[in-house]
């Protein structure tokens, strides 16, 4: 009789431990990469003013697919293809080919970043804005 009670007690304890441990699992939340954008003024060969944009992911390592840029009048510029390049957290990367730039327009520019997190391959699409002021 004592052996049966011992086995029942151990069985109940084991079952309770399994139920409690399965209920305590943390729910994983996928962190969406956050980007900041900066701009540098450039002068084109014809003397007109332009901008070169640079982005960086401030909270994750990423594999970038493309960046779609919208100028202040909400015109979509052809997407900048990042060719699946990997960037580590806080690594700055150009949002145009090295010898090109964008016509300078005052106002708020919008940047839609698309790619994958390198840690788990989860795809993302997130936006950042930059306000361009001055002459």
What is the meaning of each model-derived region?
Residues 1-11:
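Bacterial N-terminal signal peptides that target proteins for export
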Residues 3-5, 16-43:
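Bacterial Sec-dependent N-terminal signal peptides
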Residues 12-13, 111:
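Generic signature of intrinsically disordered, low-complexity, basic-rich segments
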Residues 31-135:
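First exposed extracellular module after export/assembly in secreted or surface-exposed proteins
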